Regions:
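Short acidic-hydrophobic catalytic motif
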Residues: 216-221
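Flanking scaffold residues of small Cys/His-coordinated metal-binding clusters
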Residues: 1
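ABC transporter nucleotide-binding domains
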Residues: 4, 11-205, 209-211
Length: 221
């Protein structure tokens, strides 16, 4: 069963066609790779899923229902342009975002502590974001993305800026989240990450889907 579906989604900005009747289907509890070069349309599709912008035509479905604005709480989004407030303390900021997504203060605190310990950033709780390395900041934003345990997780180039050790840590956590029931969409141009993680892929180029299917089947064709 598909957790998320986009059916013939089209989006145009002025004279630029960003998406041309794009359809994707993401199976529940899977890791789905959205591949393509810069400007292919990947980020536009992600923004439409997150209700940052709307399609000109086409339909989006989440869990068998048409996607509605209030469904955004069921989505966790890690954008390529990271967005933590530099002057705010790390722990305080993650708690704030968690409560915006519907968690009680006590539950937000418990989950944040768990993930900070797991990712070995607990010592940075009271540090300002600007005091953290880029990798540490990305770990903190990763925690913010997953903390409310959304049905659909969207990661846009999640490994950019990580050294190989920390990239491996995050890859393992993404696999762990899938085992716990999450459905993951991640956008990348890195084929090796796709082969390591993804069950299914969709390749977008010049606003259109040009290849889609199971990774193991595509690899063997």
């Amino acid at each position: 069963m598909a957790l998320f579906e986009a059916v013939e989604v089209t989006k145009q900005f002025a004279n630029h066609l960003a998406l041309d009747k794009v359809s994707v289907s993401i199976p529940e509890q899977s890791i789905f790779g959205l591949l393509g070069p810069n400007g292919a349309g990947k980020t536009t599709l992600i923004r439409i899923i997150n209700q940052i912008t709307g399609p000109d035509s086409g339909t989006l479905w989440l869990n068998g229902q048409k996607l509605k604005p209030q469904d955004v709480v069921q989505i966790g989004y890690l954008p390529e342009e990271r967005g933590l407030y530099k002057k705010m303390k790390v722990g305080e900021q993650i708690l704030y975002f968690a409560q915006l997504k519907g968690l009680s203060k006590a539950e937000a605190y418990k989950r944040t502590k768990y993930w900070f310990k797991k990712l070995e950033i607990i010592d940075w709780w009271d540090k300002k974001v600007e005091e953290l390395s880029k990798g540490m900041q990305q770990k903190a934003q990763f925690v913010s993305t997953i903390l409310h345990e959304p049905k659909l997780l969207i990661f846009d180039e999640p490994f950019s800026g990580f050294d190989p050790v920390n990239a491996s840590v995050i890859k393992n956590e993404i696999l762990f989240l899938r085992e716990r029931g999450a459905t993951v969409l991640f956008s990348t141009h890195n084929m090796s990450s796709v082969e390591e993680l993804c069950d299914d892929i969709s390749l977008i180029n010049r606003a259109r889907v040009i290849l889609q299917g199971r990774v193991d089947e595509i690899r063997n064709t």
